[in-house]
A protein has these predicted regions:
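Bacterial N-terminal signal peptides
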Residues: 13-25
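Intrinsically disordered, low-complexity regions enriched in Ser/Pro/Gly/Gln/His and often acidic
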Residues: 5-7, 18, 146
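N-terminal secretory signal peptides that target proteins for export/translocation
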Residues: 1-11
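Formylglycine-dependent sulfatase
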Residues: 27-175
Length: 175
């Protein structure tokens, strides 16, 4: 009999708690939408302070890494920029995207594919591209949209940067 009374008390308590949650406004317990900062770089390996490299000083990236996600087993899908980035942004392997060269635009091969940034947009996020995500010709296309995918962004910014403004230094073998 005591066990039955305990079960009834627990059931009554759970009912009150459940009623409280059902009566609460729908959004009041929703998790706050996280900010997402996605950085993608050409030719960047794990020679960074945040990965324990003793010589490389990368304090800004290290601070971001402390609060974010560091990948320890992430591998490039292809030895060229265009196919690798298309793979990363779609979640498909290069043989699935059929983008095996740099001069191929994503929508030429995959007109209906959903990019990672489009998925964020569908969830109510702003997806802003600053600089290069998909391939573009260097140095000719620096500061332009290049082979970008306009469907993937709510806004774009195309900075020229030092690789364009100091082009002679970039392509020089002298320090």
């Amino acid at each position: 009999m005591a066990a039955r009374i305990a079960v009834l008390k627990i059931s009554r308590w759970l009912s009150v708690v459940l009623l409280f949650f059902l009566a609460a406004p729908a959004g009041s317990f929703a998790a706050e939408k996280m900010n997402v900062l996605f950085l993608i770089c050409d030719d960047l390996n794990c020679d960074l302070g945040s990965y324990g490299h003793p010589q490389v000083k990368s304090p800004n990236i290290d601070r971001l890494a402390e609060r974010g996600v560091r990948f320890s087993r992430a591998y490039c899908q292809y030895p060229l920029c265009g196919p690798s980035r298309a793979s990363f942004m779609t979640g498909l392997y290069p043989d699935q995207t059929t983008i095996l060269g740099n001069a191929i635009r994503l929508r030429e091969r995959l007109p209906g594919v959903q990019s990672m940034s489009q998925m964020f947009i569908r969830k109510g996020y702003e997806a802003i591209r600053i600089g290069k995500i998909y391939h573009y010709g260097v140095p000719r296309d620096i500061g332009t949209d290049g082979h970008d995918d306009p469907k993937s962004w709510t806004r774009t910014v195309n900075p020229k940067g030092r690789d364009k403004t100091d082009e002679s230094k970039v392509f020089s073998l002298r320090p």
